[in-house]
Amino acid sequence: SYRQYKNEDGSIGKNQMKHHYGYFTNTTGNGKDGDAVDVFIGPNVENCEYVYVVDQNNEQGEFDESKVMLGFNSTEHAKKAYMANYSADWTGFRAITKVPLNVFKKWLYRKHKQRKPFSDYTTIKKKRITE
């Protein structure tokens, strides 16, 4: 399938998606862009204990939004999957954070809009997992 998007200059682009892609229900307005929180679905979604959250930059190199990688086996697997959904010259990758699923759920359903990269939240910094 293809995902269509609008560039900052107003032009329309599209990507061929390599993984299932969507958003979490009941999170509209919580994403940095004011939309729902986006998610890529990996092959092990039924058994995942951890979530990998990618902080993405815009064309100016500033934080744009976070993308959730759910159902991936490792940080490396999640990053590779994320990058596979963008062109070879994509420079939007900023950081990736591995956190336990229960910590992520608390962050996901908070009552405020995301204003900074996922990796910058103090509660996340204390709970992150390093590989």
Q: What are these regions, as identified by a protein language model?
A:
Residues S1-E131:
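Hydrophobic N-terminal alpha-helices or hydrophobic patches in metabolic proteins across all domains
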